[in-house]
Curated annotation (Swiss-Prot):
Note: Present with 721 molecules/cell in log phase SD medium.
Induction: By the unfolded protein response (UPR).
Example of a GO cellular component annotation carried by this entry: endoplasmic reticulum
The UniProt record lists the keyword Transcription: no
Gene giving rise to this polypeptide: ULI1
GO annotation terms (biological process): endoplasmic reticulum unfolded protein response
Role, per record: Involved in the unfolded protein response (UPR), a transcriptional response which up-regulates genes that enable cells to cope with misfolded, endoplasmic reticulum-retained proteins. UPR is part of the endoplasmic reticulum quality control (ERQC) which prevents the exit of misfolded secretory and membrane proteins from the endoplasmic reticulum.
Keywords for this protein: Unfolded protein response
Record protein name field: Unfolded protein response-inducible protein 1
Amino acid sequence: MTPYAVAITVALLIVTVSALQVNNSCVAFPPSNLRGKNGDGTNEQYATALLSIPWNGPPESLRDINLIELEPQVALYLLENYINHYYNTTRDNKCPNNHYLMGGQLGSSSDNRSLNDPQTMLWPEKKEDEKNCQETFKGACSCTKRFCKGYFSVNIFGINLNISYSSGK
């Protein structure tokens, strides 16, 4: 091969590898600079990488996060971090006692109200303060002055889950 052919081949390889990396930018694993010495990221590093994934969709739509290759505890840690980050809520924030349930359930086990708006997973009778709640939580929710609810969906371990939060009394 002539030097020109080698240069062209190398350039094509670089372009191909770059294109593949762009296509894989949605993977939940952190970039190499966030990984530990052995190539394994800590929980915090994985969470940082996951939360840095851009997403412009509405909170009630599916954000596809593939965590199937992660250990279950790491994946659940990331999920909790994502919820807290996205809704700007923690257990000691404006709405205390937040809890998160999987599988499409809303509210606590003592909450016997039925889900009567499956399209948005909101309780229509609670929409009077929805604007205030959206400003507080930056997400879809339904709330009164003392109570807020909402949800989003993720794909974890190949299963679509509706993650809901409920706070207040």
